[in-house]
């Protein structure tokens, strides 16, 4: 349980730090976060979702057969965590895309932040 708590807190801290940077840019004069902030936020989300999936697996395995019964709250959390971690926004292949950017490759528009293709003005901004 101690390992699970430490991994959870570390992943949560990374996500909160990255999302705080996004919020800071958006509450400033930016319509979109910068490329670096976008990339950091995506990396934090991928890491957070996959860490949570591993944590739920750990707890599910610790619970034994009790955890796999349909009435068990762990069973539902296992499905939810696996569903979230395999979603396109958090899937493991994104580590490869983000790693390539960290090694100096040009980011695709998905990771370019405000430097990417224009998406139009945000509501409430002109």
Predicted regions and their residues:
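Generic structural signal for well-ordered, non-transmembrane alpha-helical segments
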Residues: 2-9, 42, 46-53, 79-82
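Charged/polar positions within long, soluble alpha-helices
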Residues: 13-16, 20, 53, 57-61, ...
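Glycine-rich phosphate/cofactor-binding loops in nucleotide/flavin-utilizing enzymes
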Residues: 65-126
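General structural signal for alpha-helix termini and helix-helix connectors
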Residues: 24, 28, 61-65, 87
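Extended amphipathic alpha-helical segments enriched in small hydrophobics
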Residues: 1-25
């Amino acid at each position: 349980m101690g390992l699970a708590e430490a991994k959870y807190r570390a992943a949560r801290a990374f996500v909160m730090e990255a999302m705080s940077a996004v919020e800071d840019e958006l509450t400033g004069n930016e319509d979109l976060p910068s490329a670096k902030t976008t990339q950091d936020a995506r990396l934090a989300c991928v890491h957070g979702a996959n860490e949570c999936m591993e944590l739920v697996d750990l707890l599910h395995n610790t619970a034994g057969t009790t955890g796999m019964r349909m009435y068990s709250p762990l069973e539902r959390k296992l499905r939810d965590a696996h569903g979230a971690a395999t979603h396109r926004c958090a899937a493991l292949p994104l580590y490869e895309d983000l790693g390539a950017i960290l090694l100096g490759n040009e980011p695709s528009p998905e990771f370019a932040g405000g430097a990417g293709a224009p998406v139009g003005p945000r509501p409430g901004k002109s």
